[in-house]
Amino acid sequence: MAHRVVIVGGGTSGAVAALSALKEGLTTLIIEKNGCLGGMQTTGMVTPMMPNHMPNYPRCALDMEINAELAKFSAYTEELKQGEKATCGSFNPIFLQAVLDQLITKNRGSVVFHTAVVDAIVVDGRIDCVIVYNTGGLQAVRAKCFIDCTADAELCRMCGVGLFSGNILLKSVAESVEKSQRHMAHSL
C-alpha cells in the first residue's frame, strides 16, 4: 500500500502528527521501534501531562479528543493546583497506549511496530525512501512526505540535515528573545 505520509517515531508527537494527517484524509504510516505508541509517556511511564503555562491554556482538538477517550476508561484526571493557571493531568499509560492505537486504527492509519529506520535515500534534496529493518528483513518504504518524530532527530541526521541541540539552541533562542525585547523597548 502506498502512503502519502510516513512518520518515523510513534511517540506522543508521532501519534498526534499521524492523527492530524489522517484527519486531513492522507494515507499515513507510523514506523515505531517499540511495541506501542506513546513513547516516554507510555513506555517510560511519564504520566503527568504538564501544563503549557500559556495564557488561557490553549489546547488543540486532538489533545482534547485523546483526553476524552482516556476519561471514558476513568484513565485521565485533571487538577488545578493552587496558584496555577493551568491544569496538570494524570493518566494511565497502559490506557494511553490503547487509546492512541484505537484512534489511529479508527482513522484508518497504519503502524508497523518493532521496526527500525536504518537509512534514508535522498535524491535531489528530498527523501525518496527510508530503509527499515524488522523481522521481514530490509525493506524500502516510500512516501510523498516524511515526518521525523524520533526523539533525537534520527531521520534528519540520516539525511544530513544541520541541527542545533542542547545549550547551543537555548543560547540562540535566549539571544533572539533578548534582542527582540530591546527592540520593543526602544520602539515604545
Regions found by a protein language model. Give the residues of each.
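Glycine-rich loop(s) and the adjacent beta-strand/alpha-helix scaffold that form part
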Residues: D148-L188
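Core beta-strand elements of the Rossmann-like FAD/NAD(P) dinucleotide-binding domain
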Residues: H3, G136-C145
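Conserved beta-strand-loop-beta-strand element in the redox core of flavoprotein oxidoreductases
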Residues: I121-A140
